[in-house]
């Protein structure tokens, strides 16, 4: 399996991004036990722009954990773009956009799975981000916002056309 030029082998083991779990120490342990590709905790675009310590700390990467991706989330397109450029400075192997987080405090603002209510905006910001950064962009999302709006088929095709290198699908809706 490959993500852009990153060869992950035949049956790669991924460490998913998990808030307050996949910090640098945990990623180190997971790499020791065979993780082929890892992601940071998700990083708030707003937090990066405000230069919040907690957000900046999540950008600290080690060559020992490669390949590694930085996952970002946010609800304002310009903030997501700026955050992606800031994340790129940390030299990740990929930048992942979180369009799947179901937490109310995230989704109700239009971030995470909240983007599933605006698929055109979701695809547009993805396309802009792919063009803006020099590393592969991946996306994590869900089947749709709810059972009445399963959009993953059309969304996956549109995201592929937007230039993403890989898509992770959480196999259920937000609700």
Place the predicted regions along the sequence by residue.
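Short beta-strand/loop segments at the ligand-binding rim of alpha/beta enzyme cores
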Residues: 8-13, 66-69, 132-143
């Amino acid at each position: 399996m490959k993500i852009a030029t990153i060869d992950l082998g035949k049956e790669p083991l991924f460490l998913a991004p998990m808030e307050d779990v996949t910090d640098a120490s945990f990623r180190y342990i997971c790499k020791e036990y065979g993780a082929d590709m890892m992601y940071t905790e998700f990083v708030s675009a707003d937090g990066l722009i405000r230069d919040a310590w907690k957000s900046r700390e999540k950008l600290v990467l080690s060559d020992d954990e490669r390949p590694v991706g930085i996952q970002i989330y946010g609800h304002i397109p310009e903030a997501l773009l700026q955050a992606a450029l800031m994340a790129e400075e940390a030299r990740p192997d990929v930048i992942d956009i979180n369009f799947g987080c179901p937490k109310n405090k995230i989704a109700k603002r239009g971030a995470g799975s909240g983007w599933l209510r605006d698929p055109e905006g979701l695809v547009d910001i993805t396309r802009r981000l792919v063009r803006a950064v020099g590393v592969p962009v991946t996306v994590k999302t869900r089947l749709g916002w709810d059972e009445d709006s399963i959009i993953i088929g059309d969304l996956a095709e549109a995201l592929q056309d937007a230039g993403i290198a890989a898509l992770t699908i959480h196999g259920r809706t937000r609700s």
